[in-house]
């Protein structure tokens, strides 16, 4: 029995050995076959040093934004907790300044938003088939809130759906702009500029049914609006940016340190209202990084090129600036843009916002209104901003700016702009020249035709202004005159010349802003101060101009405002009984 077991064991071992040898033989044979050598894996280089922002082109291809979308908005009263227990008449009656005077937040109403076509709401769109409100509605904007035709913000409530992945729907009337298509035109142009970040836009025909006062099922025509994507966390994410980053809407900020206002949120003296008067918080509320950047920027001992390398992307700055200069969008010295920085980055970027003031040179001229002239053309427009004042003193920055300006000049051709204007007119004119918009249009039909024909050539005019601005001295501020021992002392900041040319000043004191009734005049003044006999009590104007050795003249930053616009280069002041001098001030609207 033992012999049989041993015999079976030997047989099993022999079989196992044979299988093992067979396996080894097979492995040896396969290992001798030639295997094609694989090439080295190609890996992308680290992007840590690449600070440039790039928009998502495919984002603009999802929807056709070339025509007009019809929107139906039914407004109704809500509740006091949400501040929606108001009438539609109240919503349209008050401006942001009225709310400030009343000490209350902007009134809202409930709304049912239903996008559709000329026949009504369309299936598949937000709000279709619904009867209960899905949104809140309020007037938006600052100075525009004083207009008879308002801009609206329609905020879709959470869980009520979105329109094109957006909950905040901003509808802009652009009442003061005669063409009514400039803002969309700007963003359509930005789509073709890789170095700039844009936003999605759409022409909208709005109809409103007011149910806040009584039962009603009739929609009233509110005319043409331009919907512009709201720059918020949702938009940051959609455009491939950091939704957790820092985002500020620049309301009135020229990059001075402003230590009394720009503080950390946990500072005992922090006042958010004052802070947001300068920079409206739209993202992360930790201002540490902002303050670090401002400290460095306002530290004259730090080289500006080093500051720019550390805290900014020069490409972003020069292309944003070049676009504003060439399009003549002058009201961007210290507002009408956003400041953005990814959460874990030191780099800050300027993002474009509000372009309805662009390409308006002829339109303003036809209205007989003086604005966006003198130093507001070319690089001098940004000289009062600490960031650009310091940056423009750098030859390297000026060289990059010049390359960007020339690049965009070759893109913003008359042919391109003419083609775009032709399309916008075909899409919008039927609404622009019909009620209710025709009743508030600031230009006549003939003027509209003149402006449309002239817009494409304004790019070249603005380019010439840009080139000439480097030849002139830079603008400067006039101080408040002082009276001492019967003498009036007038001083001002020194002007600056990019080529260090000799600068002399002309000073005039007059009783009128036309500077015809002149009391005192000094020419070829070398130092930024003069004295003259103190005038009697009354209103006076002092005008100071700087002229360099090449004969180019620049006005002071100061200006006097009348119904006809700005009168550049002068400061208005009053001498009261007893010799006290009171400065005339003007708040930008």
Can you describe what each PLM-predicted range is?
Residues 520-526:
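Short beta-strand segments within Ig-like beta-sandwich modules, predominantly Fibronectin type-III
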Residues 34-185:
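Conserved NTP-binding catalytic cores of kinases and kinase-like/nucleotidyltransferase enzymes
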Residues 174, 196-199, 215-322, 328:
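Internal "kinase-insert"/substrate-recognition segments embedded within catalytic cores
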Residues 550-582:
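Extracellular fibronectin type III
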Residues 79-81, 147, 283-291, 295-333, ...:
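Middle-to-C-terminal accessory/interaction subdomains
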Residues 535-553:
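Beta-strand-rich modules
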Residues 1-6, 14-21, 31-33:
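N-terminal secretory signal peptides
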């Amino acid at each position: 029995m033992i012999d049989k077991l041993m015999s079976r064991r030997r047989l099993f071992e022999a079989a196992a050995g044979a299988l093992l040898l067979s396996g080894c033989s097979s492995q040896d044979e396969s290992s001798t076959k030639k295997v094609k050598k694989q090439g080295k894996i190609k890996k992308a280089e680290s992007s840590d040093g690449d600070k440039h922002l790039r928009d998502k082109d495919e984002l603009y291809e999802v929807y056709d934004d070339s025509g007009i979308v019809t929107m139906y908005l039914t407004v109704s009263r809500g509740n006091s907790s949400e501040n929606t227990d108001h009438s539609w008449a109240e919503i349209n009656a008050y401006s942001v300044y009225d709310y400030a005077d009343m000490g209350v937040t902007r009134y809202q109403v409930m709304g049912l938003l239903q996008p559709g076509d000329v026949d009504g709401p369309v299936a598949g769109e937000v709000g279709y088939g619904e009867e209960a409100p899905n949104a809140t509605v309020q007037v938006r904007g600052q100075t525009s809130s004083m207009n008879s035709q308002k801009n609206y913000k329609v905020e879709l409530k959470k869980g009520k759906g979105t329109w094109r992945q957006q909950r905040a729907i901003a509808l802009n009337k652009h009442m003061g702009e005669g063409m009514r298509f400039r803002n969309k035109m700007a963003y359509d142009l930005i789509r073709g500029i890789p170095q700039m970040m844009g936003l999605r836009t759409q022409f909208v025909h709005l109809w409103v049914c007011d149910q806040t006062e009584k039962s009603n099922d009739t929609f009233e025509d509110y005319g043409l609006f331009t919907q512009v994507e709201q720059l918020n966390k949702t938009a940051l994410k959609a455009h491939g940016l950091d939704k957790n980053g820092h985002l500020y809407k620049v309301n009135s900020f020229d990059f001075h340190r402003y230590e009394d206002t720009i503080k950390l949120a946990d500072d005992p003296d922090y006042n958010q209202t004052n802070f947001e008067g300068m920079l409206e918080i739209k993202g992360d509320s930790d201002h540490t990084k902002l303050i670090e950047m401002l400290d460095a920027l306002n530290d004259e001992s730090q080289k500006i090129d080093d500051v720019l390398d550390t805290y900014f992307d020069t490409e972003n700055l020069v292309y944003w600036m070049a676009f504003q200069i060439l399009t003549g969008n002058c009201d961007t010295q210290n507002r009408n843009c956003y400041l953005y920085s990814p959460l874990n980055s030191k780099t800050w970027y300027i993002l474009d916002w509000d372009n309805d003031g662009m390409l308006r040179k002829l339109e303003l001229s036809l209205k007989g209104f003086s604005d966006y002239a003198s130093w507001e053309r070319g690089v001098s427009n940004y000289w009062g901003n600490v960031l650009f004042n310091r940056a423009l003193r750098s030859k390297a920055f000026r060289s990059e700016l010049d390359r960007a300006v020339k690049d965009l000049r070759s893109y913003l051709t008359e042919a391109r702009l003419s083609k775009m204007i032709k399309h916008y007119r075909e899409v919008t004119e039927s609404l622009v020249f019909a009620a209710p918009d025709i009743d508030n249009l600031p230009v006549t039909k003939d003027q509209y035709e003149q402006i449309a024909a002239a817009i494409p050539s304004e790019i070249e005019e603005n380019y010439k202004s840009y080139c000439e601005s480097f030849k002139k001295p830079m603008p400067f501020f006039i101080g408040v005159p002082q009276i001492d021992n019967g003498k009036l002392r007038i001083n001002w900041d020194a002007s600056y010349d990019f080529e260090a040319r000799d600068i002399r000043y002309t000073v005039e004191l007059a009783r009128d802003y036309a500077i015809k009734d002149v009391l005192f005049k000094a020419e070829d003044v070398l130092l930024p101060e003069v004295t003259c006999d103190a005038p009697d009590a009354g209103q006076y104007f002092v005008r100071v101009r700087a002229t360099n050795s090449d004969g180019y003249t620049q006005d002071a930053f100061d200006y006097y405002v009348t119904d006809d616009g700005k009168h550049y280069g002068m400061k208005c002041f009053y001498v009261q009984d007893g010799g006290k001098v009171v400065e005339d001030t003007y708040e930008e609207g």
